[in-house]
Structures are given as C-alpha cells and as structure tokens.
Amino acid sequence: MNIKQYLDSTYLKTAEQAGITEEENILVAQEFIQEAIEEHFKLIMIRPNRVSLAKKMINGANSILEIGTVIDFPEGKSAIEEKLKEAVQAIQDGADDLDFVCNYQAFKKGDTDLVKEEILRGTQLGLANNKVVKWIIEVAALSEKEIIQLSSLIKNVIVSNFEQELFSKVFVKSSTGFYTTENNLPNGATVPAIKMMLENASPLPVKAAGGVRTYEEAVAMIQLGVKRIGTSGAKKIANGQNSTNEY
C-alpha cells in the first residue's frame, strides 16, 4: 500500500487561528506545499487564497501534486450563489479538488431542498470543469441518524443526476476539523461515523478528515474503505510516526 496516495496534506489555519502574523502564515503554507511536493503526497489542501501560490510552486517544481481547497469554510451556511462564486474563483486559480462545506445547519433544521440544490449545483460546476468535488458533512455536529440521512441524501442527489462513471469524483467527507465540540469530544473522523458514511454514501467514495494522527489509524481507515485522508500530519503518518497536530 502506498499510503501517500491516500493523504491530502492539509493546512487550513488562518494567521489568527495559528497565532502568527499573515506573513508568517504564508511561510507556513509554503512549507506545507513544499513538503507535499517532496513527499509525493496525493494532494495539498489549502485555503482558497493560497491556491495560486501552490500552483506556482508546483509548476516550478515540475510536480504532479494536486491542489485542493475548501469552499464556504468552515461553517457552510453561505447562500448557494456565494458558494458557487468562491468555487469558480478557486477553479480559475488552479484548484483540482473542491471541498464544499455542506449547509449541515440547514439540513438539521429540515431544509433538505436547499441542501439538495447546493449539492446538485456545486457538483455540476465541479464536474463540468473536470474537478473532484467533496461534500463535508461535519459529523461532530450531527447525530448518528443525521450522519446516515445526510450521507444518503448526497448519494441520492449524485446517483439521480450524474452518470455512473462520475461517481468516483464526488466524495462525502467527514469533517472540517474546525468544529468546536463540548466535553472534548472528537471533532473529526471517528470509526463509527466513517462506517455509517461508508454504508450510506456508497457508491460514492468517502474521505476521513480530522483526528487521524497515526499510521495505524490511517491504515485502519483505509481498510474500512476510505479513499482519502485529510491530515496536517501527513509526513509523520507516512513515516510511521504519530502526529501531534490538531487536524
């Protein structure tokens, strides 16, 4: 198993979140991009305002590293048109993967029509531009029943509206890694949540994000059936070490 081809090396902190200056944060992003190039990871996952920087560095290195970015991150509650506008800009800047935060708050309130529309239109935009699309459902904010229902809803929208050969390009993704939980409960991918996603999103692939910090945990997720893992400790995981990073 080449575990590196499952790893989306991830750096999504703002300068404020990292407790550093904007200039310092750009340097951290550059370090993550350079590391991903050198380590031959599948993809570098960064904020939209860093996509053009990554594209420049990757081209300069003649690398095949892919670029992913997040859309409407981390809360996912912007209007559909705002989401699409941000995605269009990311595509223009050179993103290969678009990780949309699903409006899980609207879903929890019962507004499934809104959620279905954003999934349909966001996926149409991504696939029309030959991009991979991922829908983050934020499992830590959902009950078990809601994880099952939202995974199923996404699956049903895709299966009903797109050709079968495109299913592999639309993922259901567990988490942003930025959701605040109570009582120190996990805010990322857990084995029970991933199992529910795999069972109810199939035939769509699943990405586990947040909380995967060791090589053993990554292998366990892959053995369950996930196709991608998002982590800010990709190099340590690939080298069989434990990551102390939050995501």
Protein language model features and the residues they cover:
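Conserved N-terminal beta1-alpha1 strand-loop-helix module at the mouth
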Residues: 1-80, 92, 153
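Hydrophobic faces of well-ordered beta-strands that scaffold small-molecule active sites
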Residues: 2-14, 43-46, 65-72, 98-100, ...
